[in-house]
């Protein structure tokens, strides 16, 4: 009896499957992301060089864009024509990372002239020679601790050269450490690989304005519980850097980019971009005096 009932249930499920499939979501209009994409580091480097020039000219036409590529700005899908990449910007500095395992790039662009300052973080996803996704985080005046002048000043003072092999950190440990940092917003007992010296550049606010050789990034996490979700990783082993795209405070929370530079297994540089309203930094990397925090309760 049990066998008969079980067999009948399996048959009913099998017969129902086509009907369920017919009522399922429509197919995506975008080319799917690939679990194990193919690319080379040289391809990725050529791609970021073309992207930076494209941002200078206001066109991505020189990029090998898939006809069904997906375009996102601040983690919302948009039409290609609506992206800031269509606006010619006077790029003051560009820092690019390349992950030839995941076939992703990340380029941090600072714009201080032209009337509207920006700090951008743009990812390109490559597979078989074509860009299948363009994903840009755009921050500007009014966003969290924003100050493009300070961001430019301190980025150019930092060392972002490729590391010697003996200075590099295993990718799995880089991901673990980045997760420990982000988990620290909800759990204050995580094992974060703090190094010395270390400096954090958050929108424009800088933790080592005095260039101290003993500076630490361990300046405390904000109180309370804040979950950092939707994490997406890019690891540049040669640079010793991991970049994490994520959302602050839930699946619809603020779009964010955290970039961690490891040397000898420890954090030495951290850059963050967060596209939510907040207090502002000044040109020296400190807080604007009397700035109101729109996120304060």
Where are these regions (language model features)?
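Positively charged n-region of N-terminal signal peptides that target proteins for export
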Residues: 1-4
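Hydrophobic helical h-region of N-terminal Sec-dependent signal peptides
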Residues: 6-16
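C-terminal and inter-domain tail/linker signature
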Residues: 21-297
